[in-house]
């Protein structure tokens, strides 16, 4: 660690101490040396003793800067780890920082594009339209030399030196995270190193704007010609690692309820479409925008009777596999049916909790946490909080962290919050139920079986030519096993007093042959032979019994 990093580490610790964050260090013999060092090296007291811990932590992170602000924002979504009061305070962190110089932004963009801006654009505004911790945006329009002459665009450019700043602070975060489990028993449950690793992946992805471009193009294609969602066009020839250029959009911020109502927006349909957009992304596309906070969502002011969302900033996305979607759909349906045993089994069958989990205890834990939720009408139940409760219980039974589901739960809370802000009477269950039922109907039952058979047909056809040889090998092996069984039976006639041992020997040889075939032969060969073996086994046991009678 160099002098610069040491100075930064000192500043971080000093800031945490000024806000009294060290109160989480327990007063036990193990931490005595740390507490003595704290008093010797840092002559600073908690300057906000009357503020709750959550408020002090939020203020400390805000003061430490962009990287720590975004960490706090991410932690605010991990309500399976933190108390609601603390998570609520972290959610108040604002990723809004002063813009860097517009002339520097121009120079960075020109370096990325390889020429002066005037070659492609007119009216570049050096005053940033918006500025955040990672990047800021400027507006311009295509000049007369371009096919889209006069089209307004937004140019997004990374902050200078941001990658170095982030990597330096991440290294310090890892160091601090490694200390937490040693200082506090509760810290081990939080798995701080794992949390920082998850945060690092998300943050480093945001440092390559080309990934945002790819995500936006994919989302735009998924909702092409959709009345529900519009995603601005990306101009790929102008997109680079630190600069992207996209279509400029005009819309009403989704949080501006008064303006939406003044525009005559159908608020009920708007709220329902928010839920529909989310579940369409999850169950149809397996790909969802995972940063759908109010600052990234607008409403098209045209056709307010048929409202359309506009989504921007696709830097953070989530993807789901079939196992994830099955877990979600079946867990939600089982929850609303109050089938907590099925919920418990889903976690084990998914491989997310250990196979030796006590299902009875797991079921009862879900019942204790989830049953009180039904004190509310179904229409008022939050899917996001249902998932949160499931995760909270599952973590106590050693569920592995599933980052894609954490992202999904965070996004679901955003969508639900916005939906009920737009239309307080929104019935989430009735809006989401068709998506869950349609997906489950598509995935289980005869249709799903027939689809799987059709998909596997080329594989069956490819291996069909191998059938005669495989069958010949299997029969040869079966002859050897039968011969050995006959030898054993002859030998057992001389051991009539050891009936238990003899039967076990017969059973063992048969089972060994069975396992060999399942491991070495195609399924369509080994299954018929398994039937033959069981008949031989029954015959052997019968023969053995007759010998002893």
From Swiss-Prot:
Recorded metabolic or biological pathway in which this protein acts: Cofactor biosynthesis; ubiquinone biosynthesis [regulation]
Described function: Is probably a protein kinase regulator of UbiI activity which is involved in aerobic coenzyme Q (ubiquinone) biosynthesis.
Name assigned to this protein: Probable protein kinase UbiB
MF terms (GO), sorted A to Z: ATP binding; protein kinase activity
Key words, A-Z: ATP-binding, Cell inner membrane, Cell membrane, Kinase, Membrane, Nucleotide-binding, Transferase, Transmembrane, Transmembrane helix, Ubiquinone biosynthesis
Main location: membrane
Membrane-spanning segments: 505-525
UniProt record similarity statement: Belongs to the ABC1 family. UbiB subfamily.
Subcellular location: Cell inner membrane
EC number of the protein: 2.7.-.-
Domain (Protein kinase) ranges: 123-504
Binding sites annotated in the UniProt record for ATP: 129-137, 156
Designated gene of the protein: ubiB
Topology in membrane: Single-pass membrane protein
InterPro entries named among the record's database cross-references: ABC1_dom, Kinase-like_dom_sf, UbiB, UbiB_bact, UbiB_kinase
Domain of life: Bacteria
Gene Ontology cellular-component annotations: plasma membrane
Biological processes per GO annotation: regulation of ubiquinone biosynthetic process; ubiquinone biosynthetic process
Residues of the active site: 291 (proton acceptor)
Tagged with keyword Metal-binding: no
EC supergroup of this enzyme: transferase
């Amino acid at each position: 660690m160099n002098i610069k990093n040491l100075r930064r580490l000192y500043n971080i610790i000093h800031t945490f101490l000024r806000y009294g964050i060290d109160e989480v260090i327990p007063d036990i013999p193990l931490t005595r040396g740390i507490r003595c060092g704290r008093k010797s090296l840092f002559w600073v007291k908690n300057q906000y003793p009357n503020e709750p811990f959550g408020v002090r932590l939020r203020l400390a992170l805000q003061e430490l800067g962009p990287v720590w602000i975004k960490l706090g924002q991410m932690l605010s979504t991990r309500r399976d780890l933190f108390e609601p009061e603390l998570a609520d305070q972290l959610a108040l962190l604002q990723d809004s920082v002063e813009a860097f110089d517009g002339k520097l932004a121009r120079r960075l963009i020109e370096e990325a594009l390889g020429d002066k801006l005037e070659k492609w654009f007119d009216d570049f505004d050096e005053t940033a339209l918006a500025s955040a911790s990672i990047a800021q945006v400027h507006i311009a329009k295509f000049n007369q030399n371009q096919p889209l002459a006069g089209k307004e665009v937004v140019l997004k450019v990374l902050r200078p030196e941001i990658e170095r700043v982030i990597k330096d602070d991440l290294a310090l975060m890892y160091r601090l995270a490694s200390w937490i489990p040693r200082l506090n028993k509760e810290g081990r449950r939080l798995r701080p190193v794992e949390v920082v690793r998850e945060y690092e992946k998300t943050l480093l992805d945001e440092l390559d704007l080309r990934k945002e471009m790819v995500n936006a193009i994919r989302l735009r294609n998924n909702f092409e010609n959709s009345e529900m969602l519009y995603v601005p066009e990306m101009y790929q020839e102008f997109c680079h690692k630190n600069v992207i250029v996209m279509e400029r959009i005009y819309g009403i911020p989704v949080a501006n309820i008064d303006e939406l109502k003044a525009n005559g927006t159908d608020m009920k349909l708007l709220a329902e479409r928010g839920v529909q957009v989310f579940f369409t992304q999850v169950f149809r596309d397996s790909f969802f925008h995972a940063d759908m906070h109010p600052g990234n969502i607008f409403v098209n002011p045209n056709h307010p009777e048929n409202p359309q969302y506009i989504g921007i900033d696709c830097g953070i996305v989530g993807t789901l596999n079939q196992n994830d979607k099955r877990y979600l759909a079946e867990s939600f349906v089982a929850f609303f049916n109050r089938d907590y045993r099925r919920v418990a089994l889903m976690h084990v069958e998914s491989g997310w909790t250990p196979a030796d989990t006590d299902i009875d205890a797991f079921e009862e834990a879900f019942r204790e946490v989830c049953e009180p939720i039904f004190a509310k009408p179904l229409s008022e139940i939050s899917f996001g909080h249902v998932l949160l409760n499931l995760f909270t219980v599952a973590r106590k039974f050693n569920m592995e962290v599933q980052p894609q589901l954490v992202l999904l739960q965070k996004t679901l809370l955003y969508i639900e919050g916005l939906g009920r802000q737009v239309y307080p009477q929104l019935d989430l269950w009735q809006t989401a139920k068709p998506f869950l039922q349609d997906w489950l109907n598509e995935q289980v039952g005869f249709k799903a079986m027939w689809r799987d058979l059709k998909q596997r047909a080329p594989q069956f056809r490819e291996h069909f030519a191998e059938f005669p040889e495989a069958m010949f090998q299997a029969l040869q092996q079966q002859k050897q096993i039968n011969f050995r069984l006959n030898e054993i039976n002859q030998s057992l006639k001389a051991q009539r007093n050891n009936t238990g041992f003899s039967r076990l020997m017969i059973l063992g040889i048969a089972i060994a042959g069975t396992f060999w075939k399942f491991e070495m032969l195609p399924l369509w060969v080994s299954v018929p032979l398994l039937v033959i073996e069981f008949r031989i086994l029954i015959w052997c046991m019968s023969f053995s019994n007759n010998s002893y009678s």
